[in-house]
A protein has these predicted regions:
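Non-catalytic, conformational "gating/processing" segments within enzyme and secreted inhibitor domains
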Residues: 212, 233-268
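M16 family metallopeptidases and their MPP-like homologs
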Residues: 62-92, 99-228, 247-256, 304-324, ...
Length: 413
């Protein structure tokens, strides 16, 4: 036993011993002077299509057109938001008045590269208010030769999606719950993080209701008692369809070559005009309040520890210097204290420079008290920070790489 204890102490001492500069200098590395001070930056062009805003990204895509149909969710009350992601999944699979789900799936497979949904919130740069724009996105990609077919399928979904196949809807709900249960065990940090950021901004509360713990718990209740809740759920799907599928709520985005973008602009007007007309009135959702300190129980033997705050009440306080500090926090401080010495599988920082919201996240972490002690000790560690010029250069290089990632055209657009 004494041998094991002594060996453990030796390993801890070795783990805490910093690597000497001579050893580090053996590694090949770039210099700051090797970096392009003005890396290429893609910026979308704003246009118009049938009276709706169109975001255009002209990029080489090898004959593939990426089309994104965004629907403004500002008119949705809070009670509908936990069903929004499930609604998006269902309408990308369920079929229409003229095509059952099997025929719809066959045509999607023949003429497109996929039809999917997502949700995001957008905050205007320099806006110090709590405002944000919540958008439900539907993503459709296809070869340029199948542009007409792909747009026809999208138009059918937005104009005549059918919820008549109750059995298929039940299957989708139960499948999504099974996947969500697995995700809670393997990627549970996202639920903890969404609860933390829900305390900090309106955008965080939207995300909590659509993709966070609130949405997951709602899905769990629905799946475990589906027979009793089915009628209410089907009415919610119809209500979401009627509120979202309106021309005035639509925002479009397209990525492709100049010729493909031109073809899209000429043909996509039929999709826009197929949506129901009518004004879209924004509402202020009545979100529930959450306790500042919470624990969400799962059957996993590891935990996900998240702690957050609003660092910059005024976004104007932010500048690029903080990105370098963030790199040190994530790749040096958290890596050494929470991962290497604490035994967590991972740890990182979540930060939004538009809202000033900041979070510390540990991933598959066997300890709680050690991790939160490391979080609480961070301000003191920053005040005492004294980096050599070589270490600072290394952090700048790492930050540059994070801000200038290699992206395919679809991601750039």
């Amino acid at each position: 036993r004494a041998l094991v204890v002594n060996r453990t102490r030796e390993l801890i001492e070795l783990q805490n011993k910093p690597v000497d500069a001579e050893t580090l200098n053996l590694l090949p590395r770039l210099k700051v002077r090797d970096l392009d001070p003005r890396p290429p930056y893609h910026q979308v062009q704003v246009g118009d299509l049938a009276g709706r805003q169109l975001l255009v990204s002209e990029l080489p895509t090898n004959g593939i057109i990426y089309r994104h149909f965004g629907l403004d969710c500002a008119m949705l009350p809070a009670r509908l938001l936990p069903c929004l992601d499930l609604f998006g999944t269902i309408i990308t699979e369920i079929g229409t008045d003229t095509k059952d789900y099997m025929q719809f799936a066959r045509e999607l497979g023949m003429y497109t590269g996929g039809f999917s949904n997502s949700f995001n919130t957008y905050t205007r740069l320099g806006d110090t208010s709590e405002g944000c724009r919540p958008i439900a996105w539907f993503h459709l990609k296809a070869l340029s030769t199948f542009l007409d077919r792909a747009l026809s399928l999208a138009g059918e979904v937005f104009g005549s999606v059918s919820f008549a196949n109750r059995q298929r809807i039940r299957e989708i709900v139960l499948r999504e719950f099974a996947w969500a249960e697995h995700s809670v065990q393997s990627e549970g940090y996202s639920l903890a993080a969404s609860r933390v950021f829900a305390q900090l901004s309106l955008a965080g509360r939207y995300n909590e209701y659509v993709n966070g713990a609130t949405s997951y718990l709602h899905l769990k209740e629905l799946a475990l008692d589906y027979d009793r809740r089915e009628e209410d759920f089907l009415r919610v799907l119809e209500e979401l369809r009627d509120l979202l599928f309106r021309k005035e709520a639509l925002l479009l985005s397209v990525t492709g070559s100049a010729a493909d973008i031109s073809a899209f602009q000429q043909r996509a007007g039929t999709v826009v005009e197929g949506l129901a007309p009518g004004p879209v009135s924004a509402v202020v959702p009545e979100f529930s309040s959450f306790a500042p300190n919470q624990g969400l129980c799962t059957s996993a033997e590891v935990v996900y520890n998240v702690q957050g705050c609003r660092l910059f009440a005024d976004p104007g306080q932010y500048n690029g210097h903080f990105e370098v500090l963030k790199t040190w926090i994530s790749r040096d401080y958290l890596w050494n204290t929470v991962r290497q010495m604490g035994g967590a599988y991972g740890c990182f920082v979540q930060f939004n420079h538009l809202t000033g919201n900041f979070g510390l996240v540990s991933y598959r972490d066997p300890h709680i008290s050690r991790t939160y002690a490391a979080y609480d000790d961070l301000p003191g560690q920053i005040r005492a920070l004294d980096l050599s010029p070589q270490a600072m250069e290394q952090l700048i290089l790492g930050t540059y790489g994070s801000l200038d990632p290699l992206q395919a055209p679809a991601a750039k657009g």
